[in-house]
Amino acid sequence: MAMDERRGKERVQWTTTIIISSSLKSYEIATALENRSHKVRYSDTLESGSIVFSLSGVAFLLMDAKECMTSAEEIFVTKIEKFINIHQNSFLVLFAPLHGPEEWSLMFRIHQRFLGSNLRILPVHNTVNALDLMCTIAKTTSKPHIDSICYRMITTKAYIIEQSPVWRTLQKIKLSSDSVSADSGE
């Protein structure tokens, strides 16, 4: 396959089915996902503020940092807890125009509270930032793309092992140290 053909294939827009909480129906993020040609479905049963990329198996909970800081901690902690208990591959998308000391403190408290869980925190500044991150994560974890990424990594590793002068030098050093340790063991 020629390089130009591969580039052309990479430019093809990725689309998938996305389930969005009905609470986000009037928000900019829902419209933006629809504008990217994704198949958007709304659900009343999904946790408020949630977006699920069903084919990728990833779920995102959108929360505003200011709202979290002004509400009682147990309210948003309970919401996050419920979310991660339902979704195995979960991300908290924390919106703040600027991530200052208060926002980082909030993220630290959330991180400490959910340490060891399947929750990852994504600090974002705006809708475009959030969309790019969510779509990148969902795309790279979807079946055809994850297989392609794994194949590329295996191919790259094999190339490095076969072609790298550094790797060859390391192998020679290891071989010479193996022969030294074999000689000293006699």
Curated annotation (Swiss-Prot):
Source superkingdom: Eukaryota
**Would the keyword Glycoprotein be found if you checked this record's keyword annotation?**
no
Entry annotated with the keyword Ribonucleoprotein: no
The subcellular localization recorded is:
Chromosome
Q: What happens when the gene is disrupted?
A: Mice show a massive germline loss and infertility in both males and females. Defects in meiotic prophase progression and meiotic recombination seen in spermatocytes and oocytes. Meiocytes fail to achieve complete synapsis and show repair of double-strand breaks without formation of crossovers.
One GO location term (cellular component): chromosome
> Where is it made, tissue-wise?
Testis (at protein level).
Q: Which InterPro entries match?
A: SCRE
List the keywords (alphabetical).
Chromosome, Meiosis
Name which cysteines form disulfide bonds: none
GO annotation terms (biological process): reciprocal meiotic recombination; synaptonemal complex assembly
Which Pfam families did the record assign? SCRE (PF15162)
How is this protein organized at the quaternary level?
Answer: Homooligomer. Interacts with SHOC1. Interacts with SYCP1 and SYCE3.
Q: What does this protein do?
A: Plays a key role in reinforcing the integrity of the central element of the synaptonemal complex (SC) thereby stabilizing SC, ensuring progression of meiotic prophase I in male and female germ cells. Promotes homologous recombination and crossing-over in meiotic prophase I via its association with SHOC1. Required for the localization of TEX11 and MSH4 to recombination intermediates.
> What is the protein name given in its UniProt record?
Protein SPO16 homolog
What's the source species for this entry? Mus musculus
Lineage, uppermost ranks? Eukaryota, Metazoa, Chordata, Craniata, Vertebrata
Question: Quick one: which gene encodes this?
Answer: Spo16
